[in-house]
Each structure stands twice: as structure tokens, then as C-alpha cells.
Amino acid sequence: QVLLVPRGDITKLEDVITKPGTWVVSIVSAGNVLRGERRVVAFPDVRPNRQVVRQGEQMATTVLEAEERSPQEVQSRLNLLLAATFTRAQRQGALADGLQYDLNNFNRLGNQLRDRPAGQTVRLEAVSLRDSDIADPLVIELRWLQAPGSAPAGRSQP
């Protein structure tokens, strides 16, 4: 396969990246590479690198209501939390194509949430485990917090 980038775009790209600073260059395809097209036109996108997420930053929260106890309800709520986290990171400028988190801890948290005492409402949060610049992976942890008026709660551990 051949990736075709207009010369004018390459010239503009060179003008920008020769300036002082750290730059992130993305190549956006105008064709469908997966279909096996022999020639694909693409366009460069360049932007200054900057921090988009700070370590310890709360990225998203949700509440798991007392009556939400089935595996499907818990899974749905956790998926919603992950989606909200990813959306916020994208709005803040992140280019990562997903989130990184410990799958064993995710599964353990899901089991703990399903097995929690009856009538317990819990607040969940997604927190960044490290600083991330525009092109860095987004590493998060999901935490179980005590909701107002509920019994003491725990949190997932990395």
C-alpha cells in the first residue's frame, strides 16, 4: 500500500515542526486502509504536545443504586463509567484510542459490587494513575467510594 500525502501539506508540516517545542503529528487517512486499497490519500495533523490528564485527576463518576445488583446492571454501570472517562479524555485533547486499566481489578470490583450488602448505594470514580500528554496512553483505576448515607465501602487496588 502507498500512503499519498499532498506536497503542500508536507511543506506546512515541516514549517510547524521546525519551530521550538514538542509536536504531535497524526496522519489521518481519507481512504479505507483495511479494504486493501493500493493507494490511500492521507492528511497530516500537527499540534503542540501538552499535558491533557494529571495523575490523581478524577475523570468521571457514577452512582450504582442499591437496586442495581445483577451482573448486567453492574457491568452496564462500569462500562458507562469507562465510556465517560474516555470521552472526557478525548475532550481534553487525548489522542489515545482507548483506556488502560488492570482487568483483574476490574473483574474483582464487578464481583464486589454484585456481592455488596443489600440496600447499599455506591459511588464509583475513575482516576488517572499518571500524567498523560496528548499521545500518551490513558492509565486509570476504578474506585469504589462510599455514597452518602451508605455503609463503609472499599476500593479496587492496582
Which residues fall in each region the model found?
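Membrane-proximal structural modules of membrane-associated proteins and complexes
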Residues: 1-158
